[in-house]
Curated annotation (Swiss-Prot):
The lineage of its organism: Bacteria, Pseudomonadati, Pseudomonadota, Gammaproteobacteria, Chromatiales. This is Ribulose bisphosphate carboxylase-like protein. The modification N6-carboxylysine is found at K199. Belongs to the RuBisCO large chain family. Type IV subfamily. GO terms for molecular function: magnesium ion binding; ribulose-bisphosphate carboxylase activity. May be involved in sulfur metabolism and oxidative stress response. Does not show RuBisCO activity. The keyword Cell membrane does not apply.
Length: 457
């Protein structure tokens, strides 16, 4: 590629028709001239050959991806990150790259979108073996082609009649191994204690020892009994993650028998499959995060979790569970917040999804989570924090509600626990408050090279 060729892959962002492009932010490590590497990067993911032999045509103005910003983060790295790449004595340059990609190249189709922005041309571009997609921005014209969430945050709140606090979920545990009868009794107890939503674990499938039909039937009956006893709506969230050709059938069977929300693991099942199901769905859909960490965890390679969050929202998920705060989940606070923001921020006609940061939560982690997010528009999803409570799941759920009441009343957890044995038992079992707040492991804030806002994934 000559210097004159490079120019066709660079543009002033202000001069472009923003409705015709997606804007993509990448972290890139390259050898040699970073401008040449950036030009190759755009060429490979769009018009790798922009004219026919013997022709003076130029396909780049309409079809070429363009570099609109190139920032050098480190111009003299001794080698590529993670020991990737070899065979060149040229210094390695770390860059932040912003690209405008014409969405007419692939249209409003998620498999084709991912093939362009995360495909062969992106991750096998000459001289640039280290790549991480950090963010993606969609124009209104592109978003208008998608349904997005059917219910969204407002619709879910309306179904539950919960408008001024977080929505309280619980993962029924033991999550694997129980028959439907015992499993449904645990769910019933948790609803009586104050949970809004009792859910299947993401690994609980349609098995011979706990078949979906029987599970949905018994949990549906238990849900209705709990609604009659408490006077408030409840949701049973059934996991229908399965082969794509079974999704519609499993949706119908689960909903007919009593499930009033459905869990589908986004990446194992596929975003396009979820988008298909969204067109058929009668109830809210919830995403879980299996198979995302292998793409997202490395700081300088893969795809940022914020991008996965935006794609799940686009596909039609009403609720998106994501790795939450605390060291077990290997996410910085900033990255969790970035994902929550991606659920709630304006996105054209696409409704907001409810963010649910999860991982080892109990009554004592509710206050820190609420303060870090700065909004009541989130879901709180303990597992053992409810179902491993020493007084049982009804008391475990009650301890969550009592922790929220302490926040609203301006009390410490200790003060509230003096009047509530359920909360006192939770503190004794799971941890102790510190400095007037619930104990919660705090990952250190790190400004990462590729994405100070997103942190180390």
């Amino acid at each position: 590629m000559t210097a004159s060729d490079w120019a066709g892959f660079f543009a002033d962002e202000a001069s472009l028709d923003r409705e015709a492009y997606l804007f993509l932010d990448y972290y890139l490590e390259c050898s040699g001239d970073p401008e040449l590497a950036a030009a190759h990067f755009c060429s490979e993911q769009s018009t790798a050959q922009w004219r026919r032999v013997g022709s003076d045509e130029d396909l780049r103005p309409r079809f070429g991806a363009r570099v609109v910003d190139l920032q050098i983060l480190d111009g003299a790295r001794p080698e590529f990150s993670y020991g990737v790449g070899s065979g060149s004595d040229a210094p390695v340059t770390a860059c932040r790259l912003r690209i405008a990609h014409p969405h007419g190249n692939f249209g409003p189709r998620l498999p084709n979108l991912l093939s362009a922005i995360c495909g062969e041309g992106t991750f096998f571009s000459p001289g640039a073996p280290i790549v991480k997609l950090l963010d993606i921005e969609f124009p209104e014209s592109y978003l208008a082609c998608f349904q997005g969430p059917q219910f969204g945050v407002a619709g879910l709140r309306e179904r539950l009649q919960v408008h001024d606090r977080p929505i309280f979920f619980g993962v029924i545990k033991p999550n694997i191994g129980l028959p439907p009868e015992a499993f449904s009794e645990l769910g019933h107890e948790s609803w009586l204690g104050g949970l809004d939503i009792a859910k299947d674990d993401e690994m609980l499938a349609d098995t011979d020892w706990c078949p979906l039909d029987r599970r949905a039937e018994l949990l549906g009956e238990a849900r209705r009994r709990a609604e009659a006893a408490t006077g408030v709506p409840k949701i049973y969230l059934a996991n229908i993650t399965d082969e794509v050709d079974r999704l519609v059938e499993l949706h119908d069977r689960a909903v007919e028998r009593g499930a009033n929300a459905l869990l589908i693991n986004a990446m194992p099942t596929g975003l396009s499959a979820v988008r298909m199901l969204r067109k058929h769905a009668q109830v809210p859909l919830m995403a879980h995060f299996p198979f995302i960490a292998p793409f997202a965890r490395l700081e300088r390679f893969g795809v940022h979790t914020r991008v996965f969050t935006k794609l799940q929202r686009l596909a039609g998920y009403d609720v998106i569970i994501m790795p939450g705060f605390g060291p077990r989940m290997h996410m910085t606070d900033d990255e969790v917040r970035a994902c929550a923001t991606a659920c709630l921020e304006p996105m054209g006609p696409i409704k907001p999804s409810l963010p649910v940061p999860g991982g080892s939560d109990w009554a004592g982690t509710l206050r820190p989570l609420y303060e870090k997010l700065g909004t009541v528009d989130f879901g709180f999803v303990p597992g053992r924090g409810v179902f491993g409570h020493p007084m049982g799941p009804r008391a475990g759920a009650a301890s969550i509600r009592q922790a929220w009441e302490a926040i609203v009343a301006g009390e410490t957890l200790e003060e509230r626990a003096k009047r509530h044995p359920e909360l006192s038992a939770a503190i004794a079992a799971f941890g102790k408050p510190a400095h007037g707040q619930a104990a919660s492991p705090q990952p250190s804030e790190q400004a990462s090279e590729p994405d100070a806002a997103g942190g180390d994934s």
